[in-house]
């Protein structure tokens, strides 16, 4: 971080040579509370009133079985720094600083790779954890480094099929939330062989688009551009940004299924709804976060609506927008639609304004559904209070009342109750 002029992380990792685990623990206890939860991995955490630090002993890993848990940790205080650094993933992460000698330790020429903006693996130990392929993907984007040809070739040989989805998801999370240009990492995923494990992404490559609307090229190229535009629209609120960025990544998953050459040009008439199934399949292999999956699939399904509604604004009523607000949060949808709109080759003037989004946001604010969908005015408790007996008829009345509310015919609780009384005289 120092040599790349990046913000220095508050998380400090200190590797200690020449002390046993017991000796290290004894020394650290003089400065604060020591947590030994990572002791079996050769790591101790020191907590002081002002900060937390990770102290570790040099270690080597002995493979004992398959998967990322199939190894045994052996600490060795007598190990040289070069040998300890040889098990790191990339040369830029293999450097150290000798606090006693006040010198940089760089046995694998990480500084040279930083100068040339190159991401290069340290050595054969890279293969010990195939997750490093995904780390290459997200690091290449966050650092905006080019992956060396030798590293890419090495990555393509590794088996990624046994990696737990939680670990893969974390690398995707870092890619889409921390990189200014996530497209660099997505492009790298093609080079690294990652796309072989994600057919929904691979299917985007080569899918044609109408050059009138998409002069940038195929769906893959468009998706890369949309991803970068979405990154510029991130809010800093992680949950919202996750939905936006995964929505950008998945928004055109339906195009490989729906694209046809019709009436003289390439069209994808149902790609919004066709994208739901591949989006579900993709996300369920990454996470069990049902709320995230639900929100992203809804965004994919509705991503065309802002422009569609704007084009039909003289023919639609406010009920259409109220119903949309029940399915997605409108400001979030507008961000995705804006990224989709901007993710093309546009003139400077065309980029200045997303008129459809501005219009929809103003309409949503006007009818009070900008922040959430409308809540029913008439509820079961009102009908029971009016003397109606519990039963399925209550549900039918409430459903009809809510439809009238969405259409704008009922706007207050009093109007809703009055409507129920006048239409159901037995109440």
Descriptions of predicted regions:
Residues 1-427:
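Catalytic cores of the polymerase beta-like nucleotidyltransferase superfamily
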